[in-house]
């Protein structure tokens, strides 16, 4: 994520999270989300809006946060591992999408054949370092 910070590209999270997720994560990691490179303006937690993925509400809120800060949502690259809960709703609000298929355990595509799931995303990512290639920054 260092190269994203250096390029001044904001990084956010959309998560089905409980109220304790952030403080527990930060306690276990020994650092804050901000220190890790996440921008507070782009953190969407389901418990805050009482809506969970795959609801478009979280993604619409993120798109609004982008627009308010002069970022075109069509230029946002959203990476997720779940076809139904990440890729489809992110695509519906206009984000470019990357299906994370780094391992079979985390990849969630349901009964959809992989090739079909992959075709619904703008890119397939098997390693987070590939994000750099997708956003064409070096």
PLM feature segments, named:
Residues 2, 9-138:
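Asp-based, Mg2+/Mn2+-dependent phosphohydrolase catalytic module
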């Amino acid at each position: 994520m260092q190269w994203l910070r250096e390029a001044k590209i904001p990084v956010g999270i959309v998560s089905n999270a409980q109220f304790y997720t952030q403080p527990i994560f930060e306690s276990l990691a020994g650092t804050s989300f901000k220190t890790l490179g996440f921008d507070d303006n782009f953190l969407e937690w389901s418990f805050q809006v009482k809506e969970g993925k795959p609801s478009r509400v979280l993604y619409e809120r993120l798109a609004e946060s982008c627009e308010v800060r002069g970022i075109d949502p069509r230029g946002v690259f959203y990476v997720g591992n779940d076809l139904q809960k990440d890729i489809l709703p992110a695509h519906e609000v206009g984000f470019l999408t990357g299906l994370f298929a780094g391992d079979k355990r985390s990849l969630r595509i349901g009964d959809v054949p992989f090739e079909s799931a992959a075709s619904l995303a703008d890119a397939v990512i098997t390693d987070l370092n590939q994000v750099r290639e997708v956003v064409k920054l070096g």
